Amino acid sequence: LNTIKKFIKETGINRTIFLTPIQDYEFEIKKGIQSSKIKIFKNYDYNIEPTKLTEQIEEITNYRIRKQNLEDEITRIKNSDDSNKENKIKKLKQRYTLGGLNFDAVIIADFDKSLKSVTTSLLYTDVSPKKKYFITLNQWFDQSLLNEINIQPIYYPSINKENFENYKKKFLREFDEYPTHLSLLSYDLVGLIYYLSSKNDFLTTGKLFKVKNSFKGMMGIFDIKNNK
């Protein structure tokens, strides 16, 4: 979340909504939001059941209001004396909604099929990743998500893609297979211990995690304080 916070600042995003699924890890996500002090415009919890999810996304994005705005505008122009009303109506009929959204970016704290369901619902409610930032957590192991053309660009600020691709190539050369999520965590853990040891002249490891430190690994940034 600290990396996402930095990304939001660097890109000049002003209004961010945060979508959290009602899952076992919901509390951890909210705890992370609070500790990172990331600037959030509004927080929403959602039910991952498909039918309920779509209804909730419709409400969050004011979809029905924006859809009604479009229908009302078409009716208004039809009944007007505008000499160019046929062309205007034709252009309006190519749209799905009319009216702005009250956010610049959406952070989706979800994974796998559930994440895809959320992005699909956003597209259905006429929220495009080409106009609003779609941001999510570490998803580099889900190649199928990267292949979803309709939801691009989607941002994963926690990992540098170029570094990750280089790591995969090196791992493949050494072990003749692609790395798993666990192997990547192990890779970062070794780097983390080495980094902290080098800062302490390799004298002791007993107090390495008691001092506040920050380490940028392949999986993202690790913030350590009081053995946590």
Regions found by a protein language model. Give the residues of each.
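Extracytoplasmic/secretory-pathway proteins
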Residues: 89-100, 104-112
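Extracellular/periplasmic periplasmic-binding protein-like sensory domains
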Residues: 34-46, 53-86, 101-105, 117-187
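Segments of small-molecule ligand-sensing domains
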Residues: 176-190, 194-228
